[in-house]
From Swiss-Prot:
GO cellular component: cytoplasm
SUPFAM superfamilies, per database record: Nucleic acid-binding proteins, Translation proteins SH3-like domain
Molecular-function annotations in GO: translation elongation factor activity
One Pfam assignment: Elong-fact-P_C
Protein name, as recorded: Elongation factor P
PROSITE patterns: EFP (PS01275)
Family (UniProt): Belongs to the elongation factor P family.
Domain of life: Bacteria
PANTHER family: ELONGATION FACTOR P (PTHR30053), ELONGATION FACTOR P (EF-P) FAMILY PROTEIN (PTHR30053:SF12)
Organism name: Synechococcus sp. (strain WH7803)
Pathway this chain belongs to: Protein biosynthesis; polypeptide chain elongation
Amino acid sequence: MISSNDFRTGTTIELDGAVWRVVEFLHVKPGKGSAFVRTKLKAVQSGNVVEKTFRAGEMLPQAILEKATLQHTYMEGEDYVFMDMGTYEETRLSAKQIGESRKYLKEGMEVNVVSWNDKPLEVELPNSVVLEIKETDPGVKGDTATGGTKPAILETGAQVMVPLFLSIGEKIKVDTRNDTYLGRENS
């Protein structure tokens, strides 16, 4: 059990038979009446976001999530197959369960698979990944690092804005949390 006073961004709770993650929270102490906690919760399974208010100090069941580092081995139809490299046990996740993470997911990549009650819920990618540029406008002599940006499509199909001097075939580091270019990768 966790008190609503202990909510922090990222805290997970069980509510109505589902797992919810606290996205935002605000402790409110009005002049009259008792204090309360206004939250914005995101359903881990479906991605729905709701606003909910709890009394200050209200006790709620905390969802204990388990993380396992698995390797994405291959796709089978619409399912992504992950393998625990220690036990060689396979776990399958649907495209819906993976969500936006799939735009940076490539075969051979190690990720954290988050489970609740032995059911896989979502995939947590590393904060940054190295991917190759597959499609972009060609770089032109004179384009500088301080100039503008252009769209580039990466090997996984993700699109990010990159500096003008980059060209097809170069490997770049991308922040998976906010889809931004971090720099060239020397390989």
